[in-house]
Amino acid sequence: MQTQLTEEMRQNARALEADSILRACVHCGFCTATCPTYQLLGDELDGPRGRIYLIKQVLEGNDVTLKTQEHLDRCLTCRNCETTCPSGVRYHNLLDIGRDIVEQKVKRPLPERMLREGLRQVVPRPAVFRALTQVGLVLRPFLPEQVRAKLPAETVKAKPRPPLRHKRRVLMLEGCAQPTLSPNTNAATARVLDRLGISVMPANEAGCCGAVDYHLNAQEKGLARARNNIDAWWPAIEAGAEAILQTASGCGAFVKEYGQMLKNDALYADKARQVSELAVDLVELLREELLEKLAIRGDKKLAFHCPCTLQHAQKLNGEVEKVLLRLGFTLTDVPDSHLCCGSAGTYALTHPDLARQLRDNKMNALESGKPEMIVTANIGCQTHLASAGRTSVRHWIEIVEQALEKE
């Protein structure tokens, strides 16, 4: 796809990067077949090809309106289109650039600005998020439905973590929402890894991965959080930590992008590249281990929801399923497993109606095999699916750790 950049855009390094990405697109339309928002809305501009045209028009100096912004905002960034694309278009990078340019040219309505700023001020701050969640649980009957649905109906308390006692050590990003919404997930991870001879090292100075800010178009703030995490992890990396572990695939996908996002930062480019190389999802670590050491036999019938950030962003489709099968669990078939559940970070709050439709479609697919429980690998998906109030939804490592306790 050829573009005629304006003089303003020729002076913009990110616009030049967008132009190079656009050139890979042959506008074949394969991407529309797997785009969740196109399937729901049937509008070309709510599919990847249409959004690519919109970004092209922005780069060429056409009028940028609230409608332009709306169509770009509706994208889930599920990256299903990238899995489908035969030309290897880096759509998510293009979308990030397009959204950033449009954000500078179009002033959002006040309610939108307030919601986005509120999310940015609350979600990445664990103490604030925890306090407001506790208040929300008390006030649940009086809250709007889309907010009420995001509050956990139940949480499993975090079990004690084992001491640091093994030579093999990994760092773990604790996350910002997960410690409140699913407090036992990281503890369960540490307990399973301990049985495999791996200790999880704390890095208390590390915080939010930066995805919340970045995807709400506060991209510089997101990059600042990335730099903070690199600084927090660096001493442990120099001391020999073998990996930076992520138990939430959304965070993992973002940390793996640090190298790309900070490639032009002279102070952080090399460190960011090394951090991205060390970043692994939990399943990447476990699949290489002798799981027989755990001596468990899974006794549950599960449906696994593979998050978009695991299957499309990190290209780990099918890997959790393989681990669960090795451990003896029974897995049901899930129709249309490639489609997004509608969580998409904060999307369920910024676009509640679309998110609810996608959630209900996904729950129907997950429940079609009549599982005892649904498991997933990302806190956003877990919370969003659980908000339907149907089959119980947990992180898959908690079910593994639960089976471990029975032995």
Residue ranges and their predicted role:
Residues 43, 47, 83-86, 243, ...:
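Short, surface-exposed helix-loop/turn micro-motifs enriched in polar/charged residues
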